[in-house]
Amino acid sequence: MSFKISSLALAVATLSTVSIANAAGLDRSTQPSWAFTEEGTFAYVEHITIDPTIEGKDNANVATTDANFTAGRNVPDMADDYQFLNFGAKADVNDTISVGAFFDQPWAADVEFSGDNNFVGTPTAVIGGIYAQAAAGLQNAGIALPVTNATELQTAISTIQNQVTAGQARLDAANTQLATAQAALAANPALAPVLTPQITALQQGIAAGTTQVAAGTQAVKTLSTAQAASQNLSKVTGATNVSVSSQNFTGLLGVKLGEKKNIQIYGGPTIQRLEGDVHLRGNAYKTASGYDANITRDTAYGWMAGIAYLKPEIALKAALTYRSEIDHDVNMTENLPALGAAGVGTNEITITTPKSVNLDFQTGLNPTTLLTAKARWVPWSDFAIKPKIYGSASGLNLVSYDDDAWTAEVGLGKKLSPQLAISGAVGYDSGAGNPITSLGPVEGNWNVGLGAKYNLTPEWAVSGGVKYLMFGDAKAKIPDGSIVGDFQDNDGWVYGVRLSYQKK
């Protein structure tokens, strides 16, 4: 049996493109290998729009464990709409060799919190916690001074500093008296019965006074550190927001093997650019509130390789593709207000974007019907960003994931006429863990979608797809594991439009 339904395959391909557009972690676009295995000369440009809605509640306990999470204030939609462009072209040099070049945007994030909740504004509860910690420290040291606000903190510092100054003056006087008594005793040992008790008493008093002055000095230092942190945190304004973007340029060379040229191996280099900004605000992030980080644009290199089995007469195609991880040695500029001047600096760190494996399959069921299936694996559990200043202060990663992500999709397409084909698909994304980072609080998704392709001419066609995403409920956590939010019953839409050219 032989039947040509390549136009139908393209309709399903457009739908598949939008299916990956809000996957786990920072995943935004699939590998371009699907286009490289098209027949003949093929070129395309596509525009993808992601429109998620992710709302929830913050933690009324500010930051604690999942066991005693208490739903607090509303967190309005924190996921910004995101749009990106992909394009590429491939050509057959002869019946054996193919070449292609592709641009896609594989990793991205666009997050911006708003409203009145723990992800927005000055971290007043965190500042209050600093005052409480300072008061507890004084109490443990046997110093009875209240510290519940900035004024009382300054009063405590001034009071203890005055006591330290007075104590040091008494120590200086006692040391002078001790030196005089010791000199008198040395000059006239007969005075020992009188001077020895005095010298002993002075030495004991000096020892006790030295301990008290040292304790007071340490208390002033500790309180001054708390004061600096609280003052810096009190200047924090705005809302938590994150922006990460990437661009991939991939060149592929393919060779067909076998008597019928139905096995193709392909591979080539990838050039990837990565940049981003992170801004943490509000009580949720504890003393990291106010943290800013800028990831300067970096270009690094990787590779892609795969193997495909092709049987065009029944529209059969099975392809396994691997895209390598890529190490970016980026300059990251940080500002952690709680540390004052020590929290500002620029350092080089390595960010490794993850590898991925795609399995794509399609086959014609009859002359007008196409079955597709695909799976994708991304080891997000290996991914982490640990800035130098943030990591040194906390000992933690800024962003990381607990689980690897698996996605799967099954679709059917139907050719209605020589010009028009439609398709539908159902998909699943496992997500990358739950609880998960507060910068992407969903646990995967189930999705359904529709796609269509219309042939404008025998070579030119326009395709479109729309997909509805039902996000899994997730608890949001910060790097120390504290649960800071609960996000339930969220969804999203993804839209894709593609213009393509194909000449066999």
Locate the predicted segments by residue:
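Outer-membrane beta-barrel porins/channels
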Residues: 93-96, 104, 108-504
